[in-house]
Amino acid sequence: MSINSSAVGVSDWRAELPTLTAGLVVLREPISKDLQPLVELLSLADACRFGFDEPVNDVLVEQFIARVRQDRTTGLGFTFVVTTGPAATVCGLVQVRQLDPSFETGEWECMLAPAFRGTGVFLETARLVGSFVFDAVGAHRLESRVPLQNGRANGALRKLGAVQEGILRRSLRRGGEYLDQVLWSLLKEDWGPRWVSTGSRVH
């Protein structure tokens, strides 16, 4: 699989998040015109929460779009929408947040619309995001927490090369119940053949 990346201003992602491209996908920061596609995506029953504690609506997603830009400028994290095809259809959302002040460790969430699961979109997206995190951001470790019952997502992370580190018992509240989550990790030194060059490291 051939993957190319375009990273304008990648040396300072806090000032401007670059656009990353691969054969199937283009990743860019959310903008106001993404409102309705994101409302639909985040309203899915199995959607990642991305910080939402209540059912999403237009107002909450508008606030989310503004908040992710603020989080990026302060260095707390960054968010990409995943688009695909000639029409640049919004088909997913990826967010990476720092878990320590120096961003040595980050946590990511990725959500794809059902029609794009199992198509290769996730693996291309993950390779771009992982390479950006380890290269431009300079992180050493990337974690992911996935509901144990989500076999497809856990299988995709395993295929990516992530290591399962344990089960977080009843650690996620969804609706009226608490779910177990699988803790996965990716390390910079293990990224190896998945690497996609996205520019120089941020110091």
Positions of predicted regions on the chain:
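A short helix-loop-beta-strand connector motif used in the catalytic cores of GNAT acetyltransferases and
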Residues: 68-81
